[in-house]
Amino acid sequence: MPLYRKRLRLVRGEGVYVWDEKGRRYLDLIAGIGVNVLGHAHPEWVLDMSRQLEKIVVAGPMFEHDEREEMLEELSHWVDYEYVYMGNSGTEAVEAAIKFARLATGRSEIVAMTNAFHGRTLGSLSATWKKKYREGFGPLVPGFKHIPFNNVEAAKEAITKETAAVIFEPIQGEGGIVPADEEFVKTLRDLTEDVGALLIADEVQSGLRTGKFLAIEHYGVRPDIVTMGKGIGNGFPVSLTLTDLEIPRGKHGSTFGGNPLACRAVATTLRILRRDRLVEKAGEKFMEFSGERVVKTRGRGLMIGIVLRRPAGNYVKALQERGILVNTAGNRVIRLLPPLIIEGDTLEEARKEIEGVLNDIL
């Protein structure tokens, strides 16, 4: 289906590199938009997934299986939420979070942020900000309103006893790799507690990348609900909604959510991340970029945004021609979301090449 423009055709990947149909190699600094945290074709992950395919793939949500228990055990090394609801994509995790918030509070109003991105299904799209994603799909789900990101006074005015939940990204991804201010996050936590509303942290993109399992950990704040996706399964479609809320059995479900193959993907990914300390190491790999056309560098760890004085599109194309894959996050931001396995010297070489392109192209 012609939903996307024709672009580079990739045929295989290994580690931090991918190859096109002509055999040309590219350094992959976008990793499927933050998905392939272990890189491409990680041998241990591939072996575990291959063995699982020969064992059992889908069992249905009404049955127990060892893979789920193993996944929960691995997850317990990172977080201590009481309940984990599994889906197949980040947008499903957000949909679940919205449902849970409305069910738990008996309220319908959801406060979201300007420049936020939470997904493209109807509920998550209602929390998403950009007009280009929303246009043509109205009317969207009622009860959503947006406030300026990092604006404490706007939050104080918007969050009331009518609010079911506030949803935000600790680091806005599509919005330009913009970290939340500490005062803003703590204000959201205080305000939601004061009025009996819930705080939802969307970690679909920021999870795993900032030096901590969840980016929200940098703020010393515990959300009521956390959504995860993308890298949590290293490329296999899976998502998690984490909460201490007890949702009545049967109120939410998924045919494929929590299937044995998905649980295997998460369990193996988390095991490798923990053993090799890849999450902690990612926090040490943040890079600053400089040059006449660079305004500043934003982000944490391996979630990096290079803010430019000019539109980023031409630079993205030029980097592809030189064998480096990146993408944009807004009109003037180059986004880097490399695999967590990337080595420091490879990153340094990439930084020099990127700065060279930024300086060469008018």
From Swiss-Prot:
Manner of cofactor binding, per the entry note: Binds 1 pyridoxal phosphate per subunit.
Enzymatic reactions: [amino-group carrier protein]-C-terminal-gamma-(L-lysyl)-L-glutamate + 2-oxoglutarate = [amino-group carrier protein]-C-terminal-N-(1-carboxy-5-oxopentan-1-yl)-L-glutamine + L-glutamate; [amino-group carrier protein]-C-terminal-gamma-(L-ornithyl)-L-glutamate + 2-oxoglutarate = [amino-group carrier protein]-C-terminal-gamma-(L-glutamyl-5-semialdehyde)-L-glutamate + L-glutamate
Residues reported in the UniProt entry to bind pyridoxal 5'-phosphate: 90-91, 117, 202-205, 255
Chief subcellular location: cytoplasm
Positions of substrate binding: 120, 254
Subcellular location as annotated: Cytoplasm
Keyword DNA-binding: no
InterPro entries: AcOrn/SuccOrn_fam, Aminotrans_3, Aminotrans_3_PPA_site, Class-III_PLP-dep_AT, LysJ, PyrdxlP-dep_Trfase, PyrdxlP-dep_Trfase_major, PyrdxlP-dep_Trfase_small
Pathway in which this enzyme or protein is active: Amino-acid biosynthesis; L-lysine biosynthesis via AAA pathway; L-lysine from L-alpha-aminoadipate (Thermus route): step 4/5; Amino-acid biosynthesis; L-arginine biosynthesis
Cofactor(s) this protein cannot do without: pyridoxal 5'-phosphate
Transmembrane segments: none
One of the Pfam families matching this protein, by short name: Aminotran_3
Record-level GO cellular component terms: cytoplasm
Source organism, top-level taxon: Archaea
Keyword Transcription in annotation: no
Keywords in alphabetical order: Amino-acid biosynthesis, Aminotransferase, Arginine biosynthesis, Cytoplasm, Pyridoxal phosphate, Transferase
Residues found modified as N6-(pyridoxal phosphate)lysine: 230
Subunit relationships: Homodimer.
Other noteworthy facts: May also have succinyldiaminopimelate aminotransferase activity, thus carrying out the corresponding step in lysine biosynthesis.
Alphabetical list of NCBIfam families matching this protein: argD, PRK04013.1
PANTHER family given in the database record: ACETYLORNITHINE AMINOTRANSFERASE, MITOCHONDRIAL, AMINOTRANSFERASE CLASS III
Task performed by this protein: Involved in both the arginine and lysine biosynthetic pathways.
Family: Belongs to the class-III pyridoxal-phosphate-dependent aminotransferase family. LysJ subfamily.
Name this protein carries in UniProt: Putative [LysW]-aminoadipate semialdehyde/glutamate semialdehyde transaminase
